[in-house]
Structure formats: structure tokens, C-alpha cells
Amino acid sequence: MSDPTASPVASLAPAPSPVASLARTYADVTEVRASDPAAVAKAWQRRTTRPTVRGDGRLMIVAADHPARGALAVGSRPTAMNSRIDLLDRLRAALADPGVDGVLATADVLDDLVLLGALEDKVVFSSFNRGGLAGSSFELDDRMTGATAASTAGARMNGGKMLCRIDLDDPCTVSTLAACARAVDELAAHGLIAMVEPFMSNRVDGKVRNDLSPDAVIKSVHISQGLGSTSAYTWMKLPVVDEMDRVMESTTMPTLLLGGDPTDPDAAFASWQKALDLPAVKGLIVGRTLLYPPDDDVAGAVSTAVKLVR
């Protein structure tokens, strides 16, 4: 496992699964990647999968696809996500909670986790478009540079997630919409969930900003839930904003609430609790708020979120 001086949560990461682990340490992960890269695909085929919805129908998903977009900051910590080993420690600590149903991440992170045996009986969502790097001049030209429907199906995952930022003043938006529509159809053809995360966005002083007003979120939902030739497998991933009851009247799609970049975790938990009572809301899909709490108590933050969902 990692050097505990490098990761404040290293001691919380569980031992590798005896069922499917092909790597016991992070050094093992690198060695497997170097000497037997085909073992990654084998690990995905050996993994015990599970249906997305079971039991009470609620979901608690941990998200970790931010680094692939170059978004490494958390709150006031600009380099919080620099260390992959530290991130993996935090993810493994979160996934060890039996109330956590699964994870959303890019292939690099998911492959590490599957080699470590951390994805047994977990829901897994791949991440599709990471091309619009944070802060870049081409940020809204958000091309599909991550997973595909074929790779997601081949690894026996539950679905794929795509960001759909809509800037009415940026001509690249139409390409993003078309790419998301294709991804919705391709996932549906495999019987897999298309998790769509929409925002109305614009540039303010050169930086892309998401409009989190209720009416803007409602408009983004209407645009994005109409993508593709079928909505049978479409789910929404939405921010918690003011007038959330009105926002949720805009869709019949199953919806997971996202966390965003935390500024006040206590306020975030309170807002989630209220929104989770709305009928179409099926749970949380949260990353930085749970993985990088101010006190670095990942297990405590995750436990609090699980109690809200369950």
C-alpha cells in the first residue's frame, strides 16, 4: 500500500479482495501493467458484478473522473488530487463502506481499482468525454476521449457518464450535443445506462461557468433528456440548486445528485437530505466532498452520506 506519510488516509484503505485481486500493493499494479497488461481485461471478466438497482432502489456512488479533465483542485487546495496513490487510498476507503454501491471514474482509475479487487459486487460507471480540459480555450469542445459504449459493455460495467455543457454562444456546443446523442444510443444498444450531466454554461472573464439558477438547470434537463433516439436507458446527474422540487418536475428520468466542489460540507449534506426526498431522485453521485473532506475523515464523510441515502 502507499507510504502513510504521503497519504493521510492510507491506513483506511482496506486489504485487497481475496476473491479477485491481481495486485496487493500499488507497486504490484505497476508491475502487472508492465509485465501482463492483458491481466486488466481478465480482472474485469473475473469481477463479481451486480445490477444497478436492487434492494431499496437507492444508490450511493463515489465519483472520481475529475483528474482526467485536469481538474485537480478541491476547495482551497489547488493540488489536492495530484497524487494517484492518495486518490486510490481514498477511493478504497469509500468503497469499503457497505453502503457505497459503486464508483464513477475514467479507465485509468477503474483499471487500478479492479486490479486491487476493490470493485467486487459494485456498480461501475465509466466516464466518456474528458476532452474539454479545465481552463482551456477549447473547454466547450468536449470530445469523447474516455470510455466508449463498447468498452463499457466489454468490461461488464453498468453504464457510462457524459458531461453535456450547453453554451448558446459557443458553436462547439452542437458537436458536444451530437456526441452525447450518439453515446446515449450506443449505450442503449448494449442495455447500459447513459448518465447525462447537463449544464447551461457560458464564459465569464474567459472562464467557463455553469449557470446554477433553477430555470437554467431546468432548461439543461429538457435539452439533454431529449438526446438520442431512445430515452429508455437515460439517467440524469444533476446539481442540487435552489427550488429543487421545481427542477425535478422537469424530468421523469431516474436522477442522481452530484456534489460539486465543496465549500461547506455541512451545508452540502443538508441540501442533499432535502433533495433526496423528491420522488425521481434515486441517490447521490459525489466525489470531492466525500473523498477530500476538510478533516480528511473519508470514512466519516462517506458514512454521513450513506445515512442520507439509506
List each language-model region with its residue ranges:
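N-terminal amphipathic alpha-helix/helix-capping segment at the start of soluble metabolic enzymes
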Residues: 2-65, 70, 114-121
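Active-site loop/lid in soluble adenylation, ligation, and acyl-transfer enzymes
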Residues: 65, 105-106
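Glycine-rich beta-alpha junction loops
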Residues: 65-66, 261-262, 290
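Alpha/beta enzyme core
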Residues: 68, 74-98, 102, 110, ...
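Short conserved micro-motifs at the rims of enzyme active sites and ligand-binding pockets
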Residues: 72-75, 295-297
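Thr-Gly-centered strand-to-loop micro-motif
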Residues: 258-259, 286
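Short acidic/histidine-rich active-site segments
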Residues: 284-291
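C-terminal helical cap(s) of enzyme catalytic domains, especially alpha/beta-barrels
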Residues: 291-310
